């Protein structure tokens, strides 16, 4: 079975527990924290995937590192260790965020711009794209892309809205080539 399918199953299980306990936001924050630490700390990743370190040692280590997270999240980490699936932790967190966003009718957007956007600009973009996508809210993450000449690119899920200068120039070029 592919890692994506397995990750989705774990995410769905966590989502059901979170919904039942009314802690969608808390689980999301905790999963993002655990994901961030796991992805950015190569030593942690190496330790947890070492076959010569016992499962009990790994669980004790996880309890020490992530002792502040909820019992459900910690138990999920233990299950991942038992099933030798800790490597799909980032995918589980991503799948959980997708499920939680669907439940709240929220979308995450990555906005690429030539410079950091002000809070007001982010808010305006969020409002405009919330209407356009039919979502209640859009959470904006701003990424500076110095390769842009101007304008912005907005990525929401698998869709890209290209309002960059390069995008406009490319569209003009296609039109000119088509009309030759």
UniProtKB/Swiss-Prot annotation:
Keyword field contains Cell membrane: yes
Gene3D superfamilies cross-referenced by the UniProt entry: N-terminal domain of the delta subunit of the F1F0-ATP synthase
InterPro entries in alphabetical order: ATP_synth_OSCP/delta_N_sf, ATPase_OSCP/d_CS, ATPase_OSCP/dsu
Keyword Repeat attached: no
Superkingdom of origin organism: Bacteria
Topology versus the membrane: Peripheral membrane protein
GO molecular function: proton-transporting ATP synthase activity, rotational mechanism
First-listed, main subcellular location of the protein, grouped into a coarse class: membrane
GO CC terms, sorted: plasma membrane; proton-transporting ATP synthase complex
Subcellular location: Cell membrane
Keywords: ATP synthesis, Cell membrane, CF(1), Hydrogen ion transport, Ion transport, Membrane, Transport
Function of the protein: F(1)F(0) ATP synthase produces ATP from ADP in the presence of a proton or sodium gradient. F-type ATPases consist of two structural domains, F(1) containing the extramembraneous catalytic core and F(0) containing the membrane proton channel, linked together by a central stalk and a peripheral stalk. During catalysis, ATP synthesis in the catalytic domain of F(1) is coupled via a rotary mechanism of the central stalk subunits to proton translocation. This protein is part of the stalk that links CF(0) to CF(1). It either transmits conformational changes from CF(0) to CF(1) or is implicated in proton conduction.
NCBIfam families: ATP_synt_delta (TIGR01145), PRK05758.2-2 (NF004402), PRK05758.2-4 (NF004403)
Family label: Belongs to the ATPase delta chain family.
Quaternary context: F-type ATPases have 2 components, F(1) - the catalytic core - and F(0) - the membrane proton channel. F(1) has five subunits: alpha(3), beta(3), gamma(1), delta(1), epsilon(1). F(0) has three main subunits: a(1), b(2) and c(10-14). The alpha and beta chains form an alternating ring which encloses part of the gamma chain. F(1) is attached to F(0) by a central stalk formed by the gamma and epsilon chains, while a peripheral stalk is formed by the delta and b chains.
HAMAP family the UniProt entry points to: ATP_synth_delta_bact
Entry protein name: ATP synthase subunit delta
Organism of origin: Bacillus cereus (strain G9842)
Organism lineage string: Bacteria, Bacillati, Bacillota, Bacilli, Bacillales
């Amino acid at each position: 079975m592919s890692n994506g399918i397995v990750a989705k199953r774990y995410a769905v299980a966590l989502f059901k527990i979170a919904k039942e306990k009314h802690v969608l936001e808390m689980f999301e924050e905790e999963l993002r924290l655990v994901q961030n630490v796991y992805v950015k700390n190569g030593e942690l990743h190496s330790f947890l995937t070492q076959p010569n370190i016992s499962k009990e040692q790994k669980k004790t280590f996880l309890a020490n590192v992530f002792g502040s997270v909820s019992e459900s999240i910690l138990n999920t980490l233990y299950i991942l260790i038992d099933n030798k699936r800790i490597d799909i932790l980032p995918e589980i967190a991503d799948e959980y965020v997708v499920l939680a966003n669907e439940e709240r009718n929220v979308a995450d957007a990555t906005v690429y711009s030539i410079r950091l956007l002000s809070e007001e600009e982010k808010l305006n973009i969020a409002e405009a794209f919330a209407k356009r996508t039919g979502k209640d809210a859009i959470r904006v993450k701003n990424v500076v892309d110095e390769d842009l000449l101007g304008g912005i690119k907005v990525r929401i899920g698998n869709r890209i809205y290209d309002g960059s200068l390069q995008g406009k120039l490319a569209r003009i070029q296609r039109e000119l080539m088509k009309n030759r």
